[in-house]
Amino acid sequence: MNLDSKIRVIEDFPKKGISFKDITTLLKDKEAFRSMVDQLSDQLIDLDIDIVVGPEARGFLVGAPVAYKIGAGFVPIRKPGKLPGETISYEYELEYGTDSLEIHTDAIQPGQRVAILDDLLATGGTVVATAKLIEELGGEVVSINFLIELGFLNGGEVLKGYSVKSLLKY
């Protein structure tokens, strides 16, 4: 299925000059949603993945169904203060400041094979922070997979050394 035709583009959102890729139109289409999950799962099925990690918030929408389909567990990465148990955090740079992500300290066991799934690769800051948290807990980041990659933002450059795949590239 051509998933590109199911992505709505909204010009000048969230600010002028941005062409926002809205995945809600894909998610509400049962056949497109199933196709997205199937295609992402096909990229991972032979990699013996133990855990799929999805960063807040759209990584949950992409990662959880793929984890189910490939028979892996799912772990959410959250903004600070959203996880109830003991956590570790990783702070990363944004264009205008910093942000931080957290994971439960017992979410990943040493040696577990982990795939990171998210909806969109832009600059790569969120996924680098996610990978660092996984590695700090002893997990092995086997694959990083996206529905969409915005190639002109060069997020793939900061992910050199990782296996990165995207279904759609703009």
Swiss-Prot record:
Chief location of this protein within or outside the cell: cytoplasm
EC number: 2.4.2.7
Cellular location(s): Cytoplasm
Pfam families: Pribosyltran (PF00156)
MF terms in GO: adenine binding; adenine phosphoribosyltransferase activity; AMP binding
Protein origin, superkingdom: Bacteria
Claim: Ribonucleoprotein is one of the keywords in the record: no
Pathway per the UniProt entry: Purine metabolism; AMP biosynthesis via salvage pathway; AMP from adenine: step 1/1
GO BP of this protein: adenine salvage; AMP salvage; purine ribonucleoside salvage
Reactions this protein catalyses: AMP + diphosphate = 5-phospho-alpha-D-ribose 1-diphosphate + adenine
Keywords noted in UniProt: Cytoplasm, Glycosyltransferase, Purine salvage, Transferase
A single cellular component GO annotation: cytoplasm
Similarity comment: Belongs to the purine/pyrimidine phosphoribosyltransferase family.
Task of the protein: Catalyzes a salvage reaction resulting in the formation of AMP, that is energically less costly than de novo synthesis.
PANTHER family documented for this protein: ADENINE PHOSPHORIBOSYLTRANSFERASE
Subunit and partners: Homodimer.
NCBIfam families the record matches: apt (TIGR01090), PRK02304.1-2 (NF002633), PRK02304.1-3 (NF002634), PRK02304.1-5 (NF002636)
Listed name of the protein: Adenine phosphoribosyltransferase
